[in-house]
């Protein structure tokens, strides 16, 4: 959510930003916000003036009664009653206008960074940099579930009977590999100075609307029936929510947290869930990182964060590249974002395994996360988030890039301590 004062003073700039995001249907919201904000402020001013007048006039009643001027006192009482009646009309009206302003402001996208490429959808995303040499081996690489089945490592049929499509059972060495990746990612981020956190796996609606747009909420979140609770789609949401309604000491910034959690998503978007596989599913695990920092530091943190993910993937012998997300591919709260994509030798192309985002002060405004500076003034922080590793997708990239012609899978040195010293997985079939 952008600053209301900024919108008042720069309506054309806000409209231009909406156009850059190819959301022309939201253009009327800007004028609507200005109109209702004006009405709300006028109602507030009238109410303030009437309260002052009521206080002033009310003082006359006692004096008039003491002077025996009962008739004049009754006239003043009638005037006070009229003022009170008008105030009872104004107060709900002011709230109605303010609620309308807030409702519209929540729909207006954040101002994107000037460096963001302009484009309608993800086909306009721009490749930034490649890390590691993409290799296509001289033997055929099976589909990832077929590789897992060679190790008796996955059972999709049983999961389908138990929970439906979009779920899985991981077993044996593949399950161990999954757990090893999350443990390694946890220690990797702790080594970068991040504080390890196990957050709530459910959050209230005020946190949900504080961290994401209504469109994202509808497409992603599972609601607990009869409760004001939602299953998290990413631990970023509950980690950022930790700071809701707080005024923080500037000297303690930045807050850097990393967490492991299960994640639950409806995947109602254009892609939907995968028929067979673990790429796009309803339930998965993820190691996430967030940063809460001073506004002037967020660009530097953004660069650090995506580089951490690249470093981790390269330590597991997986080639990756980064893609700069274009304006139309950015979620409404994001200022700037890039995807990290891993090389798939089977598909001979890259596929998304994570994303890094700078949200400016959008989440902080919604959640009222502020900082008190040395001068005593309060301001909103900036928030950032980044995928460290999402093991189901990482498994795909890892298995394909570390597969040998005989069906065995190499375990990189970085991961071996988390696999009991195992250097290679040997298939059972």
Role assignments for model-derived ranges:
Residues 27, 130-429:
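TRNA-recognition modules of translation machinery and tRNA-sensing kinases, especially anticodon-binding
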């Amino acid at each position: 959510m952008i600053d209301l004062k900024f919108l008042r003073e720069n309506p054309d700039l806000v409209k231009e930003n909406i156009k850059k995001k190819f959301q022309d249907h939201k253009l009327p919201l800007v004028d609507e916000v200005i109109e209702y904000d004006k009405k709300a402020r006028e109602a507030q001013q009238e109410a303030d003036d009437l309260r002052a007048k009521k206080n002033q006039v009310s003082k006359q009643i006692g004096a008039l009664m003491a002077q025996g001027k009962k008739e004049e006192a009754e006239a003043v009482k009638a005037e006070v009653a009229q003022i009170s009646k008008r105030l009872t009309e104004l107060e709900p009206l002011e709230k109605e206008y303010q609620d309308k302003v807030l409702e519209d402001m929540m729909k207006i996208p954040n101002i994107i960074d000037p460096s963001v490429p302009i484009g309608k959808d993800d086909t306009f995303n721009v490749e930034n940099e490649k890390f590691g040499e993409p290799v296509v081996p001289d033997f055929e690489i099976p589909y990832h579930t077929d590789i897992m089945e060679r190790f008796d490592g996955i059972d999709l049929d049983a999961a389908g009977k138990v929970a439906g499509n979009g779920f899985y059972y991981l077993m044996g060495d593949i399950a161990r590999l999954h757990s090893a990746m999350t443990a390694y990612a946890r220690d990797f981020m702790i080594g970068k100075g991040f504080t390890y956190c196990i957050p709530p796996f459910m959050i209230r609606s005020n946190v949900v609307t504080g961290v994401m747009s209504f469109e994202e909420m509808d497409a992603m979140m599972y609601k607990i029936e009869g409760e004001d609770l939602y299953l998290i789609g990413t631990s970023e949401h509950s980690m950022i929510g930790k700071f809701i309604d707080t005024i923080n000491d500037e000297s303690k910034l930045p807050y850097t947290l990393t967490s492991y959690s299960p994640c639950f998503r409806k995947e109602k978007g254009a892609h939907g869930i995968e028929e067979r596989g673990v790429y796009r599913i309803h339930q998965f695990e993820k190691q996430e990182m967030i940063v809460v920092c001073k506004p002037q530091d967020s660009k530097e943190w953004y660069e650090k964060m995506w580089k951490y993910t690249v470093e981790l993937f390269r330590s597991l012998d997986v080639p990756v590249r980064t893609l700069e997300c274009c304006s139309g591919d950015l979620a409404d709260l994001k200022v700037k974002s890039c995807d990290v994509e891993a090389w798939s030798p089977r598909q001979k192309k890259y596929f998304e395994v994570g994303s890094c985002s700078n949200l400016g002060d959008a989440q902080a405004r919604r959640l009222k996360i502020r900082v008190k500076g040395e001068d005593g003034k309060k301001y909103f922080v900036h928030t950032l988030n980044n995928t460290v590793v999402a093991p189901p997708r990482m498994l795909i990239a890892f298995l394909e890039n570390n597969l040998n012609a005989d069906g065995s899978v190499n375990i990189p040195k970085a991961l071996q301590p988390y696999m009991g010293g195992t250097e290679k997985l040997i298939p059972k079939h």
